[in-house]
Amino acid sequence: HGYAKVIMKNSDPMTGIHIDIGNPKRLIFTESPIDLMSYYELHKDSLQNVRLVSMDGLKESTIGRHLSQIQAEISGQPLRWTPEQMADGLQVAIDHHFFEDGKNADLITLALDNDKAGRTFIQELEAKGAVINSDLPELRPGQDKTDWNDALKNQQEEKSDNSRLAQARRKLERLRGEQDEAISRAYSHQA
């Protein structure tokens, strides 16, 4: 099926849509608003003090901007960078050894589509020196790509199947009980 990757009206190409949960201390990036909402739905019980960001594609500039902003917020210092400087924030962080010796290793998670483009984007950022946690939706047998919306739909289908399975098991138990009673009555009439 097709995927819509557009820049939403009233959203800045470098900012994307974002949602803060608690007092953000880390960043999770998705490729699209629907993936952001699906990722949230799948992980809402474990998300604390995080900013979820939709990049509207695969954009290092969006990562740089939000990295710059969150570091300023955490430090309590005003951020006086231009939008262009913020867009280069990831490269500035790499150049200033922000990730050296495992520092800030938990700050950035890329929850991208599990496809060639998503995996390549992660590898390219890591090759530059960024420390990235990747959280990709699991591929099902025969799939070569999937996204967080697919993962949410798959989970909902599995839950639905499980409830039908549970209903079938209860019905089977009830029918076995009725069968046992009928057999007992039949034998009691023969005796």
Enumerate the predicted regions with their spans:
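Basic, glycine-enriched DNA-binding surface that flanks or lies within the catalytic cores of DNA
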Residues: H1-I21, D45
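Conserved phosphate-coordination/catalytic loops
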Residues: I7-K9, T30, E84, D88
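Short gly/pro-enriched beta-turn/loop segments at secondary-structure junctions
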Residues: I21-N23, S32, L47, K103
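Short active-site oxyanion
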Residues: N23-L27, D106-T109
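Helix N-cap/beta->alpha junction signal
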Residues: E31-S32, N114
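Conserved Rossmann-like nucleotide-cofactor binding loop
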Residues: D35
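TOPRIM fold recognition
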Residues: H43-A191
